[in-house]
Amino acid sequence: MAEQGKRRWWRLADGIREGRIELMYRRHAAEMSNADIAAEVVATALIHAVVGRVMALLVSEGRAWDPGLENLWIHTDNDGGIDWAGLADTTIRVVDGDVLAGEPGVVALPCEPALYVWLAHRCEPALSLIQHAMAHCAGLSERRFWTLVGESIVGAATYVPALARTNSIEGARRGQAMIAALEERGLPVRRTCFVR
């Protein structure tokens, strides 16, 4: 981010205080016939910026950058939609044994479960901030928000391996491991079944 002009870039951590998430929602709600759908569109875009994009790298290569609240920057287009995400710190996390381990800008974690625990820990504050903002400005329910998070992860685990021509079984396993890591933090990212 140090090399980027700051026009239309904003740090996710500052987005609530500056009213940017509410502004995104109001713009979408004004253009759509249903405010609930507008809320889901905005929430999905923000969720994708935090967890969806990093999941693409995780499911295809078993690596991750830091999607932490203070590290993630958002770029909006002329219509107020998200078109890019950026990082203040581009350090990549890998698992010991990865060919990148020991390279500059790379931190090796001791095992794959440690990578999921770290990533869930880094995603939670940003996702929680977005969830609270969307509940406040759009009335999006907590349950629906966390379901959208789970759908983003499952979507990445499903589609990225096909598009990147990587192992789909490995991608699905990594996606489920990430969902489990978020669940272990108490986040309800799996859909619940209704029994009648």
Label every PLM stretch briefly.
Residues R63, G68-E70:
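Canonical protein kinase catalytic loop motif
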Residues L72-I74:
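Hydrophobic residue at the +6 position relative to the catalytic HRD Asp in the kinase catalytic loop
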Residues M1-A49, A56-V59, R63, D77-R196:
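Nucleotide/phosphate-binding site architecture used for ATP/NTP-dependent chemistry
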